[in-house]
Structures are given as structure tokens and as C-alpha cells.
Amino acid sequence: MLTSFKSSSSSSEDATATTTENPPPLCIASSSAATSASHHLRRLLFTAANFVSQSNFTAAQNLLSILSLNSSPHGDSTERLVHLFTKALSVRINRQQQDQTAETVATWTTNEMTMSNSTVFTSSVCKEQFLFRTKNNNSDFESCYYLWLNQLTPFIRFGHLTANQAILDATETNDNGALHILDLDISQGLQWPPLMQALAERSSNPSSPPPSLRITGCGRDVTGLNRTGDRLTRFADSLGLQFQFHTLVIVEEDLAGLLLQIRLLALSAVQGETIAVNCVHFLHKIFNDDGDMIGHFLSAIKSLNSRIVTMAEREANHGDHSFLNRFSEAVDHYMAIFDSLEATLPPNSRERLTLEQRWFGKEILDVVAAEETERKQRHRRFEIWEEMMKRFGFVNVPIGSFALSQAKLLLRLHYPSEGYNLQFLNNSLFLGWQNRPLFSVSSWK
């Protein structure tokens, strides 16, 4: 795909050189031309990205003006995708032109949802719509979007249920029933109620003591962690499950502190307690360019001698050093996600609009506009994680057949679209849309 737009860059540059300040929208002759128009929008988008990579900002901004007029958060999946990538490219241009510092993170402004489709993303508009700052990510809104993502798509549930089943399978012969889960990104704890219920039902003898569960939940917000612990404690009480919850606050960028906490956890392990480590949508956050951070982290996890390590990650290569490679990968990945949302949610769904603009839009902004240590979305494909895990002494534990059946049931009952598919490959389970894998879950020991 990159080859095709590179080959046409010279002609595109000639075309954009004469573009007026307020170019007319692209004309679509009939509905039968929609597919052709979508391909044309994508081709223009890649051409604009190529200009940005060459620091040809004038040509890029001319194309982005055209794209902003012909894309919309309310259009079809291609138009909605192009709308977000156009804005992200505009932000990247602004930052390169203004030589802004890279010690910040991306967030959306509150008025982003009401922005006019016809807005041309000049530098001043981009500065209003996107802010790069270090704090105030509005965790309450983030929590709301996360809940919507969990309810409206199978992505989160697929990872949670499959990882849970791997933990249950690995601890089925646990003699004393004492299980300690280290959850490295617990968020709101949505993963654990189904597992807690399964553990409570394991005791077939009413006279035997109920199983024991201890969860150490990691996160950056101590208030949010305490709320999660309170909810899980109340749920455990309703099941008669012996339960303890401990918080482990992770200070952003403080990997050394996290490693110390993990090693202290290994030293304080209760005798006879089975340890499970849950890395669901976490490892990509600490994958730096040279890989040393993830290496230190995996070594620390290995020192816990856990029964099982569960991992769920995106099937995308958003950590590539090359901006153009990363851009191309991101367009294909999010195109599949947007197509899946369009097929499973109503055309005027407010929830879909919010998820695309606020959740996935923020990710797209990070992948496209951020560089070096500032970029948080460093997803890697399964083969990269597989090689990394094996390098540090982990052995792949096959995902069981029941987990596959459970995932099929999840899709059939809650997301009945023919576009979703499951694939069992390399002892791991993949969720995809059409022919593109989107998420993978694997387990290790």
C-alpha cells in the first residue's frame, strides 16, 4: 500500500500545488461510486502521510484540507476513519512546525464532538482541538468509555473470558484452593466477577472451606483502585468467597518502582499459595524501542514462579520506528475495527460515535502524532510477544477447547455478525474481523 502512494506522490504534489485555500468537496456521481470514493480517500490520506514524512507540509496541508471536507464522524466507516487520521496528521504537522516538546500525552478536548465537519484543520484549529499535556486525563470519562467498549464490542470480554479460563484450567488441581492473582492493569476489575463465581462453585462439598482468592490490582489511580477493591470485596462476600484485595500503585514511567514491588511480592508470597499473573492489554505499554524495559519486567515476572501468566494484546505493529510503516499498519487495523462497529451498531449510535472519537481517536492520535517516549500505543503482533516470552524462559501453555467454545458463545449471543471470526493458532486464540486478526490471548508458564 505504501508503494502505491509513493509512486504517485509526484503527480499528487502537482495537483495539490494549485489547490485553493477552501477546496471543493469531492464529487460522488452515484451510490455505486461509494467504493471507488473510499479508495480515493484512503489514497489521498496515504499521500498526505507521505508528504508529512518528507516535511512537505504545504502539500500535506492542501491534501488535508480536501480530506477534512470529504470526511465526517457521521459518515461511513471509511469517512469516519479518514476524519480521525486527518486530524492526527494535522496535529503532527503542528508539532513539527512549532517544535513542541515531547514530554506530554494526548487527550481530547471536551468540545471535540461538536466540531463542524467542514472545518479545515489549520494550525490554530488543531491547537484548540488537541492538547498535549501531562495530567488531567479525566479518568471518570475514561472509565465511562471503557464500560461502553466492554458492552458494545467483544474486544474486552474476549480477552477477559479467555484469560480467566486459562487461569481456571491451570489452577484446577490447586490442593488448598489458595489463589493469588497479580493483575497488572486491573482498571475497574470487570474481568474478575466471572472467575470469582467459578471459583466459588468449585467446592462441591458444603462442609469444605470455601476457596480463597487474593488479588493484587495495579494501576495509576489509588482512588480508582480502592473503588475497584470495594466492589470486588462486596461481590466476594455475596458468594461466600474468602477474598483479599491489595493495591499496587504504578507511577507512570517508574518501571524500576514496579519491578521492586514485584520482587517484594515474590519474597512475601504465602506458602502454598498459587500465583497467576494477568497481563491483559498491558505489556505494550512498557515496550520501549530497545526492548530493555520489557526484558527487565519479564525477568521479574519469571521470578514469581507463577503457575500461569495470561496475556492479551492487539494484533497490530504500532511500535514500528518508521512513521509510514506505523501509519499504514494503523490505518488497516482501525479500518477493520470501524468496519466491525458499523456492522454491529445502529447507524446513528451515539455510543459508537463516542467510542470512535474519544477512545479509538485518542489511540490514533497517539500512534500518528507522538514519537519516542511520548508514544504509548506500542502494540506488537503475537509473533513478537512469542519470541520475547520464550527468550526469557516462558513456555506457551495451550488455550483449552472450552475457552474456544466460550468465545464462540460470546460472539453468537452478544455480537451476532458474520464478520467476527476466531482462530486457534500457535496454542493461542485470535479474534478477528473478516480476514484480519485484531486481538490475541495466550498463556505461559
From Swiss-Prot:
One of its GO terms (molecular function) is DNA-binding transcription factor activity. Keywords: Nucleus, Transcription, Transcription regulation. Residues 1-26 are annotated as: Disordered. GO terms for biological process: axillary shoot meristem initiation; regulation of DNA-templated transcription; secondary shoot formation. It comes from the Eukaryota. Residues 146-217 are annotated as: VHIID. Residues 1-21 have a biased composition (Low complexity). A motif (VHIID) lies at residues 179-183. Residues 39-127 are annotated as: Leucine repeat I (LRI). GO terms for cellular component: nucleus. InterPro entries: TF_GRAS. It is found in: Nucleus. Residues 227-259 are annotated as: Leucine repeat II (LRII). Residues 369-445 are annotated as: SAW. Disruption phenotype: Plants fail to initiate axillary meristems and do not form lateral shoots during vegetative development. Residues 275-366 are annotated as: PFYRE. Expressed in roots and flowers. Residues 32-445 form the GRAS domain. Pfam families: GRAS (PF03514). Probable transcription factor required for axillary (lateral) shoot meristem formation during vegetative development. Seems to act upstream of REVOLUTA. PANTHER family: OSJNBA0084A10.13 PROTEIN-RELATED (PTHR31636). Belongs to the GRAS family. This is Scarecrow-like protein 18.
